[in-house]
Amino acid sequence: MILPHDVPSQHGSVSAFAERLVADNSPRLYLLEDESRRDARDLVFQVGYRNEAERITALVGPCNLGQAVDASTDHALLVLLGEYAQHLGLIERLQAVPIDQRRGDYPPQSKLIEFLVGILAGLEHLEDLNQAPNPLVKDQAVITSWGQAGFAHYSGVSRTLSAAGDDTLSEVIEVLGTVSQPLIDAEVMALARQGRALVLDTDLTGRKVSSTSTTYPGSGFGYMDGEIAKGFQAAITSLTGGPCGRLLLSSQRYSGPAQSAECLRAAVQKMEQVLGLHPHRRTEQVQQRLQTLAANQDRLQASLDAEYARQRDLFDALQAARREKALRQAEVEQWTAESQARGWVERPHSKLAQARQRVVRAQKRQARAGRELRATAARLTRWEHTLAEGQVQQTQLLDWLAQLESENATLLHPLTCVLRVDAGFSTDDNLTWLIEMGYVVYTKAHNGQTTAKLCRQLPATVTWHRVGRNAEAVYLPHQRIAECPYDLEALLVRYHVPTGYLYTTLLYYGDRPPPPWLKDWFSGYNARQTIEAGIKEGKGVFRLRHPWVRSPIGMELQEQFSLFAANFVRWAAQWAKQLVRHANRALNDALTEVKTLVQDVAHCRARLVHNALGRALIFDEQSPYAGSTLCLSGQVAFQHVLPFFKSLNFLPPETS
């Protein structure tokens, strides 16, 4: 067991303790034989008492403790994560992933696990597995905690990632999803118990590569991080507001030219698949669209029928004009022949001249009927095409309605789902789709012309309300935005900038009115910066800024492992709080900060004490977390390492 220091104790200097050594034979002072610290300059001693062992025996009873192991690690967090991975069954599942590669010194699945451990360690490059100051491949405590016989050279890991195929990727995604699902469900359940909505975010981020590289298959030029660059795009979704703060739900990779709008639907569908739930579909809205479309189709069909009748009339008029023209032409020929036979001179009002005028009028009537007939034919073609499109749309809407009704039929406990997306996603079609999918939508206007139009419609006496440090807003209800068939609530925002004003428009759709306080609306939308923070964390903490390998499957594995790592560290931190037997303030703070855990605690020295009673992780006395202890399993008896010639706490012999 771990003996806490919460019983009565005395505090004194080493000199005072030395006097007790002379007066009392109970305490013992001995050197710590720690082979892993042979280069340490400080002389380290352990202090204890003879009766301490007696007290342990009395507490645990007679038992065989077996072979005790007192090891050290330079990667304390990774030992904890390895224990947690075994607790979740992650390692066992990853070891069953198929990889088409011959086994060398280590199985390919072991290298896949090593790859994940490197990501969890926040290594900058794959070669840091071997070349970092304290290389992971030499840390036996980490290797053991992850259930491996050893870690391979980084070049072997790279070859394994190159050998991985689509079946490897799909199986890894399934394993990570299976392990994550109960924990995601717990996050959702915690929100549901509180009656809170699920707040979801979607964003597109770039994965840059060298602009001159030709060895990244599928990469291309696109807009990334405010500039045109070469690489890939990743559509990320997240859930916020639960006990873990933020969980990343899915990541889908696209080529560099991909744009936000075309990635939205796949991202939302994948997000729903991961969550295992969705909001109540708004089938009544689809039914209303169908009714409106049917009425439009009926009106169009009536117009078509009338136009067909007009076409027939015009055709008859054209035929009549042709017959009249032929008749009048015959009259002209007759009068011409008679005039020539009698030697008449053609006068302006003669019979011949009048006959010629009747021919001209007949020609004009024929030409007019022909023009109207051609215009009618073009109009009929256009309306027939519109009618056909409407029929196709009706069929699609009927199928869409049937799908939504089917999804509603299997939905037992619908939750309110709020989805926040930026302007790049909010095209007319995407807004319509999200509304009918049942989401409460917070977004920005996709087209700047929308904001310009709303500004032109503002009355001169409008009152602006402050919503931010340099932002003011005005509420504009029930706005039709471009081709979206539904009314949206608009918040026209203007920012004070040195050159004047900068305008933008926030949009909202939900079953309830938007937040009554415009500042809450403004802040609620801008809180989507949490997913931007998650993207930044992925690039800066889990090193997605640079691809570790060039193979397409390897890059996709890095993407999926990094997304999982962001969640895994959060879950492990929650788990670790239950294992703490003693923690200073620094460790308590670190357990709430992923960046600190990965960049500091993951590279912090600690002792791993292990015997038949259990395992404990004790942070090094030189670390910021000195003396902090995590009981990984069971109960472990151990002694703290204390520096020589320093003050110390000790238990007097009579204390029990």
Model-derived features with residue positions:
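Anion-binding and metal-coordination hotspots
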Residues: 2-72, 91-656
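Structured, non-catalytic alpha/beta "coupling" segments that mediate domain-domain communication
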Residues: 69-84
